[in-house]
From Swiss-Prot:
Location, primary (coarse class): membrane
Keyword Transmembrane helix (UniProt): yes
Keywords associated with the record: ATP synthesis, Cell membrane, CF(0), Hydrogen ion transport, Ion transport, Membrane, Transmembrane, Transmembrane helix, Transport
KW Nucleus (keyword) present: no
The protein, known as: ATP synthase subunit a
GO molecular function: proton-transporting ATP synthase activity, rotational mechanism
Function recorded in the entry: Key component of the proton channel; it plays a direct role in the translocation of protons across the membrane.
Tree of life domain: Bacteria
Compartment(s) where it occurs, according to its Swiss-Prot or TrEMBL record: Cell membrane; Membrane raft
GO BP, one annotated term: proton motive force-driven plasma membrane ATP synthesis
UniProt membrane topology term: Multi-pass membrane protein
One GO location term (cellular component): plasma membrane
Length: 242
């Protein structure tokens, strides 16, 4: 079944800018859940960590390992909180659309994973790529940063510039494609469960269980891949040579 998106447009200087209200809602829900998780897990910190504090420290150590695998900690340490926030945000965003969806009578979809929207994932990837340029210039200086585009010889500049666009697209669309495809199949299986007779239940229930588990795995892996590639791109820009 096709679902509609709750769209609103805003005219700015003669141009219509369209907003997807469900995506905005889910972005805010995800941000709130990340904030809530951080508050809950960091209350009453102790020198000897237990329970929730162990979980938080494991996340920080795991992300530190990703950063150190791509650049020296002396340079990469400043991106630690950024990477931790990103991996938590993307993981939670990937999970939100799995247990259920909220659809109104007119087939308007309100509850979904925000990462099932290409606009959201491409905005995330664009932000990351822009940050790599910002820190590349800040840490290496404009001259050294620009020299990286013409090394080892200047004709590569065209390829290097083109690579920036392809990196942005692949980083965002990979995340979107995997999450969107997973939710589409879950919707089809759920439709089979609710709309077909008993034989539909026999097929859909095992399928839903298996695909839910697989979608959790895919959502986790995609969060990891996004952070890994983000740190790879960052290391290419802040390294003395790339």
């Amino acid at each position: 079944m096709d679902h509609k998106s709750p769209l609103v447009s805003w005219n700015l200087f003669g141009f219509d800018i369209v907003f997807n209200l469900s995506s905005i809602l889910m972005i805010l829900v995800t941000a709130f859940l990340v904030f809530l998780l951080a508050i809950i897990c960091t209350r009453n910190l102790k020198k000897r960590p237990t329970g929730k504090q162990n979980f938080v420290e494991w996340i920080f150590d795991f992300v530190r390992g990703i950063i150190e695998g791509n650049m020296a900690w002396k340079k990469g340490g400043q991106f630690h909180f950024l990477a931790v926030t990103l991996i938590l945000y993307i993981f939670i965003a990937n999970m939100l659309g799995l247990p259920f969806s909220i659809v109104t009578k007119d087939h308007t979809l309100w509850w979904k994973s925000p990462t099932a929207d290409a606009t959201v994932t491409l905005t995330l990837s664009t932000t990351i790529i822009l940050l790599t340029h910002f820190y590349g210039i800040k840490m290496r200086g404009t001259k050294q940063y620009l020299k990286g585009y013409v090394q080892p010889f200047w004709p590569l500049a065209i390829i290097n510039v083109f690579e920036e666009f392809t990196s942005t697209l692949t980083l965002g669309l990979r995340l979107y494609g995997n999450i969107f495809a997973g939710e589409i199949l879950l919707t089809l299986l759920a439709g089979l469960f609710f709309n077909e007779p008993a034989w539909g239940w026999i097929i859909s229930i095992p399928g839903l269980i298996v695909w839910q588990a697989f979608s959790i795995f895919v959502g986790t892996i995609q969060a990891y891949i996004f952070i890994m590639l983000s740190m790879v791109y960052m290391s290419h820009k802040v390294a003395d040579e790339h």
